[in-house]
């Protein structure tokens, strides 16, 4: 999201004010993190994918941060990076539209996506019953959604920002944020579940936790 070679003067951690630091987002739990390069003069470009769970990872995790901790540039980059993550994991997000279930008698998980009301919900449910959606374009055409990628981006950003949401479809709410919430949130973790299932069944779906700058 943002890479500051000379450090971040506004950072709450003193050691980040004079050393290189990057603000990144995970592509499974959508956790916002600050990381430091392990090697000098590491070249990190916008939207680079950095492997975290490998021995030779070029960065080390320093801390979990909140949306409010992001720099102005990181906030500006966030929608573009999220859109890339969604498109890179398109089959997994299509599965969300195919398998999302009711949360209560009156609320369906799909209704948490901005722009999905009762009428659109019924259309999506009817269409996926006839035939599972095969792509986000298919969701748009048969499900009646306009720009589903942007709608997913908006939902993920809302989950990153909010202290009031009860249900988290994609973002894992970190411990510090949960402490600030009046009510304990419910993490549904659709993307995590689909990735795990794809690994267990050997399906050809994108997987593995990584970070995006």
Regions found by a protein language model. Give the residues of each.
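Small-residue hinge/turn detector
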Residues: 117-118
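Structure-specific DNA junction-binding interface
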Residues: 1-88, 180-213
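C-terminal extensions
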Residues: 88-112, 126-213
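Conserved hydrophobic/aromatic packing and binding residues within compact polymer-binding modules
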Residues: 121-124
